[in-house]
């Protein structure tokens, strides 16, 4: 798949610059390559980060000519309600509220919202809103993302 090839191609450059490629999505019409990045040093991704990353990978993409024709390149931050793309992301966001959609239902549900309370191997434990817990195997997670909570809002705005 083209997205995977692009991600594989740009990841070494991203790592060298201190970034992690979260997602790559090439849309054919109109031709747009959207890349979502994060920083390894836990700092926020700023506009200057996106500009520097864009400039660096543009050269790599042009040399390899992996995308035929002209296209627009968009580089953006993962944002507050970011997707969790791998097990490392779940570890990084331990204690955060997330929403998960499952491949196979657990207790007749395929969608849960809860706080990541524990990770042991491939098993992720969520504290649910009804004060119960659920253990989910990482391979059973179809999609997961951070949920923007009132507590997160208070943390962001407390210095303003």
Swiss-Prot record:
Its main location: cytoplasm. Disulfide bonds: none annotated. Keywords: Cytoplasm, Ribosome biogenesis. The keyword Cytoplasm applies. It comes from the Bacteria. The keyword Cytoplasm applies. GO terms for cellular component: cytosol. Signal peptide: none annotated. It is found in: Cytoplasm. One of its GO terms (biological process) is ribosomal small subunit assembly. Pfam families: DUF150_C, RimP_N. Belongs to the RimP family. Required for maturation of 30S ribosomal subunits. This is Ribosome maturation factor RimP. The lineage of its organism: Bacteria, Pseudomonadati, Pseudomonadota, Alphaproteobacteria, Rickettsiales. The gene is rimP.
């Amino acid at each position: 798949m083209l997205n995977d090839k692009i991600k594989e191609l740009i990841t070494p450059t991203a790592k060298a610059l201190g970034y992690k490629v979260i997602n790559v999505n090439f849309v054919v019409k109109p031709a747009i390559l959207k890349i979502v990045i994060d920083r390894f040093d836990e700092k926020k991704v700023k506009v200057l980060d996106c500009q520097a990353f864009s400039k660096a990978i543009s050269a790599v993409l042009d040399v390899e000519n992996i995308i035929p024709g002209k296209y627009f390149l968009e580089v953006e931050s993962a944002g507050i309600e970011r997707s969790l793309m791998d097990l490392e992301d779940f570890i990084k966001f331990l204690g955060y509220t997330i929403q998960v959609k499952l491949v196979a239902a657990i207790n007749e549900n395929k969608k849960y919202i809860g706080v990541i309370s524990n990770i042991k191997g491939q098993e992720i434990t969520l504290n649910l809103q009804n004060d119960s817990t659920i253990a989910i195997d990482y391979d059973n997670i179809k999609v997961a993302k951070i949920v923007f909570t009132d507590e997160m809002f208070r943390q962001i705005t407390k210095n303003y």
